[in-house]
Design a protein with these regions (language model features):
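Sec-dependent bacterial lipoprotein signal peptides
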Residues: 1-21
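Mature, structured domains of secreted/extracytosolic soluble proteins
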Residues: 21-842
Length: 842
């Protein structure tokens, strides 16, 4: 092979050299090796059975390139293949019954779509430039070689195309380059495609030892010419439609296509110099690679597929640009039910699997809501062809993580598109039916861990979620993503167990939940957390997850922060009025919402990860900003406040003899959620200067006390009196309820501080504004001044330090290293007050 390549290079070089040294060229030409054939064009012409292909080359302007210059790879077909094509039903319907009836655009497509840059053997075509497996490659087909002019009758019938009822449009099925799909022996070996797979991909008799381009067999390969290589096909070289195009044009799939038409729209590709608009067809989809979540008017899509089935350069899970080469190694797969299968599913027959949907929506697919239709459609999409071939059917999972329940005898046909394979199947793979937010968890085979966790043997959460009088937003994590859970209890452990990571899994033998415990730093397994039955330790952690991932009440589009059932703050990421991701205070980045179901009592949203709580206590955060963190201080803005708390003994380790804080906690916090408004060092100094509180040195020296106040008190009692004044000041800066910038709007919402009014025996109030961008506080002192008609002021939180999330955790053992569960906890959101400010209660 190396020798052949060398002669090709020599041959090409000599051809170029002829322009400057004719006699030398002629001398070398006479010494060409016997195996080196003529140029590409002459070879085809001399065969005598490639008249159509030679004419194609001439008509498309490639005569000189194929005869004299260039470095070409060409897939060609003899005349017999053209004659077969002219007699085909598709060609007859389009009027292509002879060569002279082919439009120029069709000729360009026939030639350029089977041309590849540079001269390459089949073996070389199987490899990327970096030596990887090359399953798909682009062709020399120009995107605008053929642009269909579509009338309204042939457009998808939906609201996005209705504006074109009275006209026509130039509509590309996709605006990315076309690709060839190479079922070459080296490729199939690398991708572990079997003979059995090939039977369903390319038909009976197909073998991994043979070479195929799409579903066309290469009957003769590596034909060597002076200026390139030729590979002969057993049928005319026509790049197939993409998946969406095939489904649209295949009569047996018209019902499925009718539903899919709801979720596409024309998007402007470009405007020509003549002002003519060219559009491309886009499908609404939620993929990371090539998402299309809003329509051209900026509205949230009525429903979304997992990916765009029309994207020629389909690639799943990469950065998703048309120049990214991630498409080379794989393509998509779609399992599309035939019309007969759809009718059998969606039927008046009470035994039909889709009978309930049929009854609910009047027996018409047109009445089925967009979201349900989208759920049904995308349940038939898989991100990887390679991982969904028939040899994988026994373990095949859909993109929500549960079994596809597909068998080989369900396949009644297949079509290799340029961006994926379409399997025609004789059954519908339906969405899950449910009423409450836990319904999907009850029936979804991909949510077995959550299903068990909600049940009687673990957290008994099902009784709570059954309430139809409440509104829930339930964020559930699929089994395959029930991993990388940072165990909050393990922060109190030592050695390799400290800060453990849990990967939950199902023990199918005992129908219980286990967790592989890993070291966070190394990722190494350090054991399996289970008792062989129902583990109390796991129940504690699962309860924490369920509480963290359940919102009670309505959610408002645009509002970012919410407080969960377990008092944890979580952030929602919106795209218009749709939640596209969620983030716990302990997550480094948002967790994608990969599915959503609206139910009677709320919504169920699938996550591809576990929402984490903050790993830091309030003590830890104050210490970090007091120049005293063991891991290195961030700054010292909280130093004065931290020093006061520490001096007053407000940080405690063991609230009781049977439990302990992970590090330290504020002693007066209960199991609830709070806001802490921390005066900076200058704010504390201002309070001291205004005589509101004593300094620590004042307390030690018993300053700022009158004889009347301290009559009869000894020195320590005097200090304690001053210390209590400082404690009451500290406690007034911490209120019940977490106020978060970006959370629920407040307009002088009244909340209770942690400082008790000993006269009324009620806690002093704090009045708070929160408008999505700032928190402003009216303390009780200024509130009373306003009531009296006096001047007053509100205090803003700092734009520099705010929305800092903390969690004070108490575990069920006096020794944190022996803890197995969570005893109690509190959540806090910490804000620094603006420079020089503090809060007064009187």
């Amino acid at each position: 092979m190396k020798i052949h390549r060398l002669y090709i290079v020599i041959g090409l070089g000599l051809t170029l050299f002829a322009t400057s040294c004719t006699d030398r060229f002629e001398e070398e030409e006479n010494n060409e090796p016997a195996w080196l054939g003529p140029n590409v064009y002459d070879y085809l012409e001399q065969r005598g059975d490639c008249r159509y292909f030679c004419q194609l080359i001439r008509d498309c302007g490639y005569y000189e390139s194929m005869k004299r210059t260039g470095s070409n790879t060409l897939f060609f077909s003899p005349d017999s293949c053209f004659e077969t094509f002219f007699r085909s039903a598709d060609a007859v319907n389009k009027g292509y019954t002879s060569y002279d009836k082919l439009p120029q655009s069709m000729k360009y497509m026939m030639l350029r779509s089977c041309m590849v840059e540079n001269a390459q053997l089949i073996e070389r075509l199987s490899k990327t430039d970096h030596g990887g497996t090359l399953f798909r490659r682009t062709t020399m087909m120009e995107l605008e070689d053929t642009i269909p002019v579509v009338t309204y009758a042939d457009m998808p019938h939906n609201i996005y195309f209705d504006r074109y009822k009275d006209g026509e449009m130039k509509l590309l099925m996709d605006a990315s380059p076309w690709t060839l799909v190479q079922f070459f022996p080296d490729v199939m070996s690398a991708l572990k495609i079997t003979d059995k797979d090939m039977k369903y991909i390319c038909g009976d008799g197909a073998s991994i030892d043979r070479t195929y381009l799409f579903q066309s067999r290469i009957v003769r390969q590596d034909i060597t010419c002076k200026n390139g290589y030729l590979h002969e096909l057993d049928r005319i070289c026509m790049v197939p439609d993409n998946m969406a195009g095939y489904i649209r044009n295949e009569n047996r799939l018209s019902t499925f296509n009718h539903l899919m038409d709801r979720f596409c729209e024309p998007v402007l590709y470009r405007t020509t110099v003549d002002g003519e608009r060219i559009y491309e067809l886009r499908y609404f989809n939620e993929s990371v690679s090539h998402p299309h979540r809003t329509d051209i008017d900026g509205r949230i899509a009525p429903g979304m597929l997992y990916f765009d089935p029309g994207w020629n350069l389909y690639q799943y899970g990469s950065s998703g640009t048309n120049s990214n080469n991630a498409y080379e190694g794989d393509m998509a797969a779609m399992f599309v039910p035939t019309n007969e299968a759809m009718a059998e599913y969606f039927s008046a027959d009470p035994n039909a699997e889709g009978h309930d949907i049929y009854e609910s929506f009047g027996g018409s697919w047109d009445n089925v809501p967009d979201q349900i239709a989208a759920d049904l459609l995308k349940n038939h999409q898989l991100s990887s062809f390679v991982n969904s071939t028939p040899s994988h059917f026994g373990t095949l999972k859909d993109m929500a993580g549960y079994d596809m329940e597909i068998k080989e005898d369900n396949i009644v046909g297949s079509y290799v598109a340029r961006n994926g394979i379409v399997y025609l199947i004789n059954k519908v793979l339906p969405p899950l039916d449910y009423r409450s937010v836990m319904g999907p968890v009850k029936v979804d085979q991909g949510l077995k861990i959550f299903n068990l966790a909600m049940g009687d043997n673990y957290c008994q959460f099902q009784y709570y979620l059954r309430s139809l009088k409440s509104t829930f937003n339930f964020f559930v994590t699929l089994d395959e993503y029930m991993k990388d859970y940072l165990d909050p209890i393990s922060a109190g452990y030592s050695g390799v167990r400290m800060n453990s990571i849990y990967d939950f899994r199902l023990n199918t033998n005992t129908n219980t939940i286990e967790a592989v415990v890993r070291n966070a730093a190394t990722g190494d397994s350090i054991g399996i957390n289970t008792s062989g039955g129902i583990s109390g330790a796991l129940t504690s952690r699962l309860t924490d997850i369920l509480n963290q991932q359940t919102l009670v009440g309505e959610i408002i589009p645009g509002q970012e922060w919410y407080i969960t059932k377990g008092y944890a703050p979580i952030r929602l990421v919106w795209a218009g009025d749709k939640v596209v991701a969620a983030q716990g205070a302990g997550n480094a980045s948002p967790i994608d919402v990969i599915d959503e179901y609206d139910k009677t009592n709320g919504a169920t949203r699938y996550l591809n990860g576990i929402l984490r709580t903050s790993p830091y206590s309030m003590y830890n955060i104050l210490r970090q900003h007091a120049g005293a963190s063991a891991s290195g201080s961030v700054d010292d803005k909280f130093k004065a406040f931290y020093d006061m708390c520490e001096y007053c003994g407000l940080f405690e380790k063991n609230p009781t003899t049977t439990c302990a804080a992970i590090d330290y906690r504020l002693s007066f916090l209960s199991q609830y959620h709070y806001s802490a408004y921390i005066p900076g060092n200058d704010g504390v100094e201002a309070a001291i200067g205004d005589g509101i509180i004593p300094s620590i040195s004042d307390i030690e020296n018993c300053s700022l006390t009158s004889e009347e106040e301290t009559a009869g008190l000894d020195l320590e009692e005097k200090r304690e009196m001053l210390r209590q004044r400082m404690i009451r000041f500290i406690r007034y800066h911490i209120q019940d309820y977490s106020i978060i910038i970006g959370g629920q709007n407040e307009n002088e919402g009244q909340f209770l501080s942690s400082t008790l009014n000993t006269t009324t025996n009620k806690f002093y109030p704090i009045y708070v504004d929160q408008d999505g961008s700032n928190v402003r506080i009216l303390d009780n002192y200024n509130y009373q001044r306003r009531r009296q008609g006096l001047s007053f002021e509100k205090v803003d939180v700092s734009s520099e330090l705010n929305n800092i999330m903390a969690r004070d955790l108490i575990v069920n053992s006096a020794a944190t290293t022996a803890a197995t569960g969570i005893e109690t906890y509190s959540y806090s959101v910490i804000h620094l007050l603006e420079d020089g400010k503090y809060l007064r209660f009187e």
